[in-house]
């Protein structure tokens, strides 16, 4: 029983430690989600936690929304073979 608890705790820990992080990216333009209030930022946090993103926490870093705890399926900046175009 103790072994099962230890294995479960390790799996949870690995999932938390190895979670993806990065800048949120607009898939159509290839650009980062921008922000102006550096540090704790409600807009970035809300975007990161949105169902389509799946992150656990977001804040403004270097004028872009940085997300932590993202699933591997969520794309982050830069997108492969796509440059930022603000058209």
UniProtKB/Swiss-Prot annotation:
Pfam short name (any one): Toxin_3
Annotated compartments: Secreted
Covalent S-S links between cysteines: 31-84, 35-60, 44-65, 48-67
PROSITE patterns: LCN_CSAB
Keyword Secreted tagged: yes
Signal peptide residues on this chain, from the entry's feature table: 1-19
Domain of life where this protein originates: Eukaryota
Residue ranges of domain LCN-type CS-alpha/beta in the record: 20-85
GO BP: defense response
Keyword Signal among record annotations: yes
GO cellular component: extracellular region
Tissue and organ distribution: Expressed by the venom gland.
Keyword annotations of the record: Disulfide bond, Ion channel impairing toxin, Neurotoxin, Secreted, Signal, Toxin, Voltage-gated sodium channel impairing toxin
Sample GO molecular function, one term: sodium channel inhibitor activity
Note on domains (UniProt): Has the structural arrangement of an alpha-helix connected to antiparallel beta-sheets by disulfide bonds (CS-alpha/beta).
Family: Belongs to the long (4 C-C) scorpion toxin superfamily. Sodium channel inhibitor family. Beta subfamily.
Function: Beta toxins bind voltage-independently at site-4 of sodium channels (Nav) and shift the voltage of activation toward more negative potentials thereby affecting sodium channel activation and promoting spontaneous and repetitive firing.
UniProt-recorded name of the protein: Toxin CngtIII
Species name: Centruroides noxius
């Amino acid at each position: 029983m103790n072994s099962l608890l230890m294995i479960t705790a390790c799996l949870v820990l690995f999932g938390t430690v190895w979670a993806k992080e990065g800048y949120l990216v607009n898939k159509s333009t290839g650009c980062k989600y921008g922000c102006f209030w550096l540090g704790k930022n409600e807009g970035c946090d809300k975007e990161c936690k949105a169902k389509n993103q799946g992150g656990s926490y977001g804040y403004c870093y270097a004028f872009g929304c940085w997300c932590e705890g993202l699933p591997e399926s969520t794309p982050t900046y830069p997108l492969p073979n796509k440059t930022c175009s603000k058209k």
